[in-house]
């Protein structure tokens, strides 16, 4: 759903990438800083119930996902190592967001049910990424699906932000349901995406 906007977003980020390169910041540095920042914010802010603050800070660090590749292309240094590092660290960031949400519901959110749903969304997000990686290692394509990484991040972080603002009275209280609804969608969409990718790989393997 959101992958179609990636090219336009890259153009927006190009000036910032150029500025960082002028300061002698490397793409790998941006990748590491972005991942560490996102993981720390997710595992510190969300379990404490600092939802809107955490979502905002995590989003800022996740911007590095667009920056590092943009910087590498401007340097003409795109490499297998850079792609591998970026994909590997992305999994840490994705996992930390859902783990932070699960810890929130295990603590101040007081809901075993939604903690479990958050863990299910976490597992499915990791399996979705694994299916694609394994398919590509077998020279097959499995990029399709209704819940790509960009979709998962946008929906989860927007849902956390809305719920956080509703909890502090900035938005209507009924919007506290934004996060549970978002988790339900991501769990169902994740399961469908895994099924779509497995089906695609099966068809390719039999053709």
Predicted regions span which residues?
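Active-site His/Glu-centered metal-binding helix of metallohydrolases
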Residues: 63-71, 84, 88-92, 96, ...
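Hydrophobic/aromatic-rich structural module bridging two neighboring secondary-structure elements via a short loop
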Residues: 50-77
